[in-house]
Amino acid sequence: MQIALAPMEGLVDEILRDVLTRIGGIDWCVTEFIRVSERLLPAATYHKLAPELFNGSRTRAGTPMRVQFLGSDPQCLADNAAFACTLGAPVIDLNFGCPAKTVNKSRGGAVLLKEPELLHAIVREVRRTVPAEIPVTAKMRLGFEGKEGALDCARALAEGGASQIVVHARTKVEGYKPPAHWEWVARVQEVVGVPVFANGEVWTLDDWRRCREISGVDDIMLGRGLVSRPGLARQIAAVRAGEEPEDMSWAELQPLLLDFWQQARRKLAPRYAPGRLKQWLAMLTRTYPEAVALFAEVRREQDCERIDQLLALSP
């Protein structure tokens, strides 16, 4: 069984990957998508979105990181994937699940689920171009509007050469609205001969248990559930090891929240750093009452030094 941290554009950047993987329980993580259209991207683009490439493609905690691409041109994607491998990418992941309208309008992400033949062509060309020892994996949703093409899309990915498929158990149109249709993950697993990961609507340990029972797969990718409950992967890992699954207390999370903020201040412009903190805090309010109180204090603050003080004073 493996537990993966989902690639969420605009949320799970290098800073949050660093913090969440240090908490434990995560077997591997994925970069935000690298968007490819018509040209070979420079090394600086990869290093900006995936600075872990300088650290053997691992986070500070030693968690392996995969490089994810998004686009619709098979040859361009393949060329960029091959270049990423020369920079140290250990696994190439392909995004066929992003539901964002701006991405879909430019023929990226979930809109490609309308074209299983193109999915196959993309994976086949990337698989043909990158070194044989580099795995090529893919992430998909159940479809764009309906689910009737889900199995065809999954087959296209597997037959094209994907060695692993993550299934976000909703369509593009469903977005992030509950429920996630975990029973469809089971159907996908039945028609492909590669490992399948379940993804979507796993917020708690009980959600994970239900997902595993309904989907029939052991492997899980956690996204918003892990961001809002940072100890969730550690809890799941404890259960699978036969240990007591202790939740993460606010007191244990506080130093990591402060470290997240300090990294944001160092790496981002002062006008952007507060927004990143507020984004994570807002998600933490789902789990921690203390986060509700702290978020209420910082939500209108743009002064970084004042936020320093509020974080230092928070109980």
From Swiss-Prot:
PANTHER family: TRNA-DIHYDROURIDINE SYNTHASE, TRNA-DIHYDROURIDINE(16) SYNTHASE. The keyword Oxidoreductase applies. The record marks R35, N95, Y176, R276, K278, R299 as: Interacts with tRNA. Its cofactor is FMN. Catalyzes the synthesis of 5,6-dihydrouridine (D), a modified base found in the D-loop of most tRNAs, via the reduction of the C5-C6 double bond in target uridines. Specifically modifies U16 in tRNAs. This is tRNA-dihydrouridine(16) synthase. It comes from Aquipseudomonas alcaligenes (Pseudomonas alcaligenes). InterPro entries: Aldolase_TIM, DUS-like_FMN-bd, DUS_fam, DusC, DusC_C, tRNA_hU_synthase_CS. It holds the Pfam family Dus. The keyword tRNA-binding applies. The gene is dusC. Disulfide bonds: none annotated. Its EC number is 1.3.1.-. The active site is at C98. Belongs to the Dus family. DusC subfamily. Keywords: Flavoprotein, FMN, NADP, Oxidoreductase, RNA-binding, tRNA processing, tRNA-binding. Signal peptide: none annotated. HAMAP family: DusC_subfam. FMN binds at P7, M8, E9, Q68, K139, N199, G200, E201, G223, R224. It catalyses: 5,6-dihydrouridine(16) in tRNA + NADP(+) = uridine(16) in tRNA + NADPH + H(+); 5,6-dihydrouridine(16) in tRNA + NAD(+) = uridine(16) in tRNA + NADH + H(+). GO terms for molecular function: flavin adenine dinucleotide binding; FMN binding; tRNA binding; tRNA-dihydrouridine16 synthase activity. It comes from the Bacteria.
